[in-house]
Amino acid sequence: INAEKMVLKFGRKTRKFATYVVAAGLQYGAEGGMLHTFFKMAWLGEIPALPVFGDGTNVIPTIHVLDLAGVIQNVIDHTPKPHYLVAVDESVHTLEDIVKCISKNTGPGKIQKIPRENAYLTKDLTQDCLDHLLVNLRMEALFVKENFNIRWVAQTGFVENINSILKEYKQSRGLMPVKICILGPPAVGKSSIAEELAKYYKLHHIQLKDVISEAIAKLETIVAPKDIGEGKEEVEEEEEEENVEDAQELLDGIKESMEQNAGQLDDQYIIRFMKEKLKSMPCRNQGYILDGFPKTYDQAKDLFNQEDEEEEDEVRGRMFPFDKLIIPEFVCALDASDEFLKERVINLPERIVAGTHYSQDRFLRALSNYRDINIEDETVFNYFDEIEIHPIHIDVGKLEDAQNRLAIKQLIKEIGEPRNYGLTDEEKAEEERKAAEERLAREAAEEAEREHQEAVEMAEKIARWEEWNKRLEEVKREERELLEAQSIPLRNYLMTYVMPTLIQGLNECCNVRPEDPVDFLAEYLFKNNPEAQ
């Protein structure tokens, strides 16, 4: 309030300096604004109900962020006389209305009222957000409505425009669903590849048997006897009775179908359950990986076609009534030769083969059925080609990769980056912990390798030193032997020709005792040289 007064005061003091205060309601739109926390909780789907702080009856004035921008633009263009303006849309929504709307359209569909004080424990909510969410104020922007020319984005308010607001939110934050369908013959690696892609993209891995089991379990829960509380309204009881009757009728039809088809469920029920699964909120938010279904052209057509024949989507210049809400964005066609697939199944451990369709008879029958279905012009891949969703063909047999790492890498390259919020705080902490452990293990391995290398080098150095010393001693010994061998003739010569005359000369020198013994000895040797004689 003090800031608003100061701004208005500056405008009154200086005529050339016009100032305005625009009192805006809670802003929504684009990335979600102050309602982003509720959008995120709903989109992630990790809680059974969105929280409503307090009783939720407080009225919150709101305005779309683009409409607020339009109001400000009009203030700049027209410089109106009032310097204090109210900018809100025409809605009168409570906190409960807003949260319930978010939960219904992109979340679990339920809300839970919690104490008002718990709002302060929500770490993603700032004090400014809480002030806007907990306010109870009715406002009407009469001047803006009567005097400004605004192209309203959400004039009627948040609830009435939730579809466009949700679209903005998902596009702004890059949260568009990733929808993938993986098809191929048995044992080609569909499930293992789908499982890895589901982990990487944080998608829902959809397998036919799980969908059927989940749907039947849900129907059985509906028809199971319940204790009805005294406070139930009559209308709610009637609706519940109708749901029970419909569920029981559907269960009876399923039972009859399985009895008539040797335990196999008729396509009409499979398509119904699969379509309900693909239209569920988690699949609409994050996306899905459809594993091995549909198998035929007719199944694909029944699953992905629009239920209302009048609603048709134009696809690149042609009309085709497929349901854009559930149609896959990427279709992966895995394949391999029959010999490769048979060899892969033969090499599977017995514990994996037991109780599955990988037993020899069942596998060969399933492989033969797949080949028979996919030799005609109307295959499941032809359906996707017709709506210009061209499959990504991968020959697993040529990759020579038992773990399918190369196929997964190729698919990730085709599909692109994940479209989600990324890692949660817990996942980041886990990733950091794993990275730290890997770093420590790597450093320890490098240190051990370095020590081992140093020890090996030292051992080699000592061995080389010992070898060198050994060879040096050998060389010295050989040199001594050579010198000794070479000195024998010289010694013989000395003993024969030199030493007798030298001894006589020394004896004579001792007898005579000349003044210069050396000259005397030299003269004696010269005179008495045997060779000279």
Curated annotation (Swiss-Prot):
Main location: cytoplasm
UniProt xrefs under CDD domains: ADK, DD_AK7
Domain of life: Eukaryota
GO terms for cellular component: cytosol; motile cilium
Catalytic activity, as annotated: AMP + ATP = 2 ADP; a 2'-deoxyribonucleoside 5'-diphosphate + ATP = a 2'-deoxyribonucleoside 5'-triphosphate + ADP; a ribonucleoside 5'-diphosphate + ATP = a ribonucleoside 5'-triphosphate + ADP
Residues holding ATP: A187, V188, G189, K190, S191, S192, G397
Role played: Nucleoside monophosphate (NMP) kinase that catalyzes the reversible transfer of the terminal phosphate group between nucleoside triphosphates and monophosphates. Has highest activity toward AMP, and weaker activity toward dAMP, CMP and dCMP. Also displays broad nucleoside diphosphate kinase activity. Involved in maintaining ciliary structure and function.
Record EC number: 2.7.4.3, 2.7.4.6
A GO MF label: (d)CMP kinase activity
Family label: In the central section; belongs to the adenylate kinase family.
Region (DPY-30): 489-533
Coiled-coil stretches: 419-487
Region: NMP, residue numbers: 207-265
Residues where AMP binds: 242-265, 292-295, 299, 365
Top EC category: transferase
Subcellular location field: Cytoplasm, Cytosol; Cell projection, Cilium, Flagellum
Pfam family, one: ADK
InterPro entries, alphabetized: Adenylat/UMP-CMP_kin (IPR000850), DD_AK7 (IPR047499), Dpy-30_motif (IPR007858), NAD(P)-bd_dom_sf (IPR036291), P-loop_NTPase (IPR027417)
Keywords tagged on the record: ATP-binding, Cell projection, Cilium, Cilium biogenesis/degradation, Coiled coil, Cytoplasm, Flagellum, Kinase, Nucleotide-binding, Transferase
PANTHER family (alphabetical): NUCLEOTIDE KINASE (PTHR23359)
Disulfide bridges in this chain: none
Organism, as annotated: Macaca fascicularis (Crab-eating macaque)
Renumbered residue ranges of the record's region LID: 347-357
Region (Adenylate kinase): 177-426
Listed GO biological process terms: cell projection organization
Protein name: Adenylate kinase 7
